[in-house]
């Protein structure tokens, strides 16, 4: 919304970061998922279990999606982990009601091996929503942008993280 952006800027707000958000109907995402099983198992985790995995990210999550926000959300969010030989190789935090993916990240050494696809597949099975949404992805994030595009999850819009210096 260009008009709203101009109003915020006229009030002294500055853009810190630009974020993309992606959406797709759940069934269309399923059609893009491989039936070839990855060499990982998907397990339920607690939000604290992903503290050691923050290095998996290619960008720092927005304040709405950071670990503190995830902890505050409590049971409204589900955290799944992908384990390869008992080692956490990736994780996904999402809302089963809304279909919003708050965070999805894979250790760079395990990328392109089906880990994120396995997490996405399990998330889709657990969500009640007919829509999958990935929100607040810093622009650009080539690895996540390409992964989502390969699964048919389309860019739906852009948002800004803004700050007002007092």
Can you say where each PLM-predicted feature lies in the sequence?
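A short, internal acetyl-CoA/4′-phosphopantetheine-binding micro-motif in the GNAT/acyltransferase core
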Residues: 104-112, 138
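Conserved acetyl-CoA pyrophosphate-binding loop and the N-cap/start of the following alpha-helix
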Residues: 110, 114-122
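Conserved GNAT acetyl-CoA-binding A-motif
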Residues: 19, 127-140
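Amide-forming acyltransferase catalytic core, primarily the GNAT-like/NAT-type
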Residues: 11-93
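Conserved active-site alpha-helix within GNAT-family acetyltransferase domains
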Residues: 1-17, 117, 138-158
């Amino acid at each position: 919304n260009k008009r709203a952006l101009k109003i915020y800027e006229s009030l002294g707000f500055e853009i810190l970061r630009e974020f993309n958000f992606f959406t797709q109907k759940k069934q269309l995402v399923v059609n893009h998922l491989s039936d070839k099983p990855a060499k990982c198992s998907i397990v339920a985790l607690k939000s604290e279990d992903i503290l050691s995995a923050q290095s998996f990210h290619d960008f720092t999550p927005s304040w709405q999606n950071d670990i503190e926000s995830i902890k505050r959300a409590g049971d409204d969010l589900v955290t799944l982990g992908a384990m390869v030989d008992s080692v956490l190789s990736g994780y996904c935090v999402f809302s089963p009601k809304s279909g919003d993916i708050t965070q999805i990240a894979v250790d760079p050494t395990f990328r392109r091996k089906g880990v994120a696809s396995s997490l996405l597949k399990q998330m889709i099975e657990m969500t009640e929503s007919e829509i999958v949404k990935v929100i607040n992805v810093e622009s650009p994030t080539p690895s996540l942008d390409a992964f989502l595009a390969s699964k048919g999850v389309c860019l739906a819009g852009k948002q800004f993280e803004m700050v007002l210096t007092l």
